[in-house]
Amino acid sequence: MSKMNAFYAQSGGVTAVINASACGVIETCRRHKDKIGKVFAGQNGIIGALTEDLIDTNKESKSTIAALRHTPSGAFGSCRFKLKSLEDNKREYQRLIEVFKAHNIGYFFYNGGGDSADTCLKISQIGKTLCYPITAVHIPKTV
Protein backbone atom coordinates (compact mmCIF):
# COMPACT_ATOMS: atom_id res chain seq x y z
CA MET A 1 0.00 0.00 0.00
CA SER A 2 1.39 3.39 -0.95
CA LYS A 3 1.78 6.17 1.56
CA MET A 4 -1.11 8.58 1.72
CA ASN A 5 -0.62 12.33 1.87
CA ALA A 6 -2.13 14.69 4.42
CA PHE A 7 -4.24 17.83 4.08
CA TYR A 8 -4.04 20.51 6.78
CA ALA A 9 -6.02 23.76 6.92
CA GLN A 10 -6.94 26.57 9.28
CA SER A 11 -10.51 27.72 9.86
CA GLY A 12 -12.43 30.52 11.54
CA GLY A 13 -10.86 33.42 13.39
CA VAL A 14 -7.15 32.83 13.77
CA THR A 15 -5.71 32.65 17.28
CA ALA A 16 -2.30 33.15 18.82
CA VAL A 17 -1.65 29.40 18.81
CA ILE A 18 -3.07 28.29 15.46
CA ASN A 19 0.32 28.36 13.70
CA ALA A 20 1.91 26.43 16.58
CA SER A 21 -0.67 23.73 15.92
CA ALA A 22 0.23 23.82 12.21
CA CYS A 23 3.88 23.35 13.15
CA GLY A 24 2.98 20.39 15.35
CA VAL A 25 0.94 18.67 12.66
CA ILE A 26 3.55 19.17 9.93
CA GLU A 27 6.49 18.14 12.13
CA THR A 28 4.65 15.07 13.39
CA CYS A 29 3.72 14.00 9.86
CA ARG A 30 7.36 14.43 8.82
CA ARG A 31 8.41 12.10 11.65
CA HIS A 32 6.14 9.40 10.22
CA LYS A 33 7.48 9.24 6.67
CA ASP A 34 6.77 5.52 6.63
CA LYS A 35 3.02 6.29 6.73
CA ILE A 36 2.55 9.86 5.48
CA GLY A 37 4.04 11.28 2.29
CA LYS A 38 3.49 14.97 1.71
CA VAL A 39 1.58 17.46 3.82
CA PHE A 40 -0.52 19.85 1.76
CA ALA A 41 -1.90 22.99 3.40
CA GLY A 42 -5.14 24.40 2.07
CA GLN A 43 -4.92 28.07 1.13
CA ASN A 44 -7.76 29.75 3.03
CA GLY A 45 -9.08 26.68 4.79
CA ILE A 46 -11.38 24.14 3.18
CA ILE A 47 -11.74 26.53 0.24
CA GLY A 48 -8.18 25.57 -0.69
CA ALA A 49 -9.31 21.96 -1.06
CA LEU A 50 -12.38 22.90 -3.09
CA THR A 51 -10.34 25.10 -5.46
CA GLU A 52 -7.29 22.81 -5.39
CA ASP A 53 -5.18 25.67 -4.06
CA LEU A 54 -2.74 23.54 -2.09
CA ILE A 55 0.62 24.44 -0.57
CA ASP A 56 3.20 21.64 -0.53
CA THR A 57 4.71 22.14 2.92
CA ASN A 58 7.40 19.55 2.13
CA LYS A 59 9.07 22.25 0.05
CA GLU A 60 9.59 24.28 3.23
CA SER A 61 12.69 23.80 5.34
CA LYS A 62 12.65 22.37 8.84
CA SER A 63 13.51 25.81 10.25
CA THR A 64 10.71 27.53 8.31
CA ILE A 65 8.17 25.08 9.71
CA ALA A 66 9.62 25.43 13.23
CA ALA A 67 9.27 29.23 12.94
CA LEU A 68 5.50 28.78 12.71
CA ARG A 69 5.50 28.28 16.49
CA HIS A 70 6.11 32.01 16.92
CA THR A 71 4.40 33.37 13.81
CA PRO A 72 1.27 35.45 14.43
CA SER A 73 -1.96 35.18 12.44
CA GLY A 74 -2.84 32.28 10.13
CA ALA A 75 0.10 31.23 7.97
CA PHE A 76 -2.05 29.53 5.34
CA GLY A 77 -5.10 31.77 5.44
CA SER A 78 -8.43 30.89 6.95
CA CYS A 79 -12.12 30.90 6.11
CA ARG A 80 -15.50 30.63 7.75
CA PHE A 81 -16.93 28.43 5.03
CA LYS A 82 -19.45 25.88 6.30
CA LEU A 83 -20.06 22.72 4.35
CA LYS A 84 -23.73 22.03 3.78
CA SER A 85 -25.10 18.55 4.28
CA LEU A 86 -24.36 15.88 1.69
CA GLU A 87 -28.03 15.90 0.71
CA ASP A 88 -27.97 19.67 0.13
CA ASN A 89 -24.73 19.84 -1.84
CA LYS A 90 -23.41 16.48 -3.03
CA ARG A 91 -21.34 18.16 -5.78
CA GLU A 92 -19.23 20.00 -3.17
CA TYR A 93 -18.34 16.72 -1.49
CA GLN A 94 -17.64 15.00 -4.79
CA ARG A 95 -15.24 17.84 -5.59
CA LEU A 96 -13.41 17.34 -2.30
CA ILE A 97 -13.03 13.62 -3.02
CA GLU A 98 -11.77 14.44 -6.55
CA VAL A 99 -9.06 16.69 -5.10
CA PHE A 100 -8.17 14.19 -2.37
CA LYS A 101 -7.84 11.42 -4.97
CA ALA A 102 -5.77 13.61 -7.30
CA HIS A 103 -3.27 14.30 -4.50
CA ASN A 104 -3.51 10.91 -2.76
CA ILE A 105 -4.80 12.53 0.43
CA GLY A 106 -5.85 10.09 3.13
CA TYR A 107 -5.48 12.30 6.21
CA PHE A 108 -7.51 15.45 6.84
CA PHE A 109 -6.41 17.76 9.68
CA TYR A 110 -8.66 20.77 10.27
CA ASN A 111 -7.58 23.42 12.78
CA GLY A 112 -10.36 25.58 14.19
CA GLY A 113 -13.37 25.82 16.49
CA GLY A 114 -16.76 24.15 16.64
CA ASP A 115 -17.65 24.62 12.98
CA SER A 116 -14.32 23.03 12.07
CA ALA A 117 -15.16 20.02 14.21
CA ASP A 118 -18.43 19.77 12.27
CA THR A 119 -16.47 19.91 9.00
CA CYS A 120 -14.26 17.03 10.18
CA LEU A 121 -17.32 14.98 11.05
CA LYS A 122 -18.79 15.61 7.59
CA ILE A 123 -15.50 14.72 5.86
CA SER A 124 -15.34 11.49 7.85
CA GLN A 125 -18.93 10.66 6.94
CA ILE A 126 -18.53 11.39 3.23
CA GLY A 127 -15.43 9.25 3.16
CA LYS A 128 -17.67 6.36 4.14
CA THR A 129 -20.66 7.40 2.03
CA LEU A 130 -18.64 8.07 -1.14
CA CYS A 131 -16.29 5.12 -0.52
CA TYR A 132 -13.06 7.07 -0.10
CA PRO A 133 -10.81 6.11 2.81
CA ILE A 134 -9.92 9.23 4.80
CA THR A 135 -9.05 9.89 8.42
CA ALA A 136 -10.37 13.25 9.62
CA VAL A 137 -8.93 14.90 12.74
CA HIS A 138 -10.11 18.15 14.33
CA ILE A 139 -7.41 20.28 15.96
CA PRO A 140 -8.73 22.89 18.43
CA LYS A 141 -7.46 26.40 17.73
CA THR A 142 -7.30 27.51 21.35
CA VAL A 143 -5.26 26.47 24.35
What are these regions (language model features)?
Residues 18-21, 50-55, 87-88, 118-124:
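Short acidic, glycine/serine/threonine-rich loops at helix termini
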Residues 9, 42, 110-111, 137-139:
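Structural motif
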Residues 124-143:
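Short, acidic/small-residue loops that bind anionic groups at enzyme active sites
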Residues 5-15, 75-80, 106-112:
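Short glycine-rich or small-residue beta-strand-to-loop segments that form or flank ligand, phosphate
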Residues 52-106, 115-116, 139, 143:
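Glycine-rich oxoanion-binding loops at beta->alpha junctions
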Residues 1-4, 9, 37, 66-68, ...:
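N-terminal low-complexity/intrinsically disordered extensions
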Residues 2-54:
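N-terminal phosphate-binding or glycine-rich loops at protein starts, especially the Walker A/P-loop
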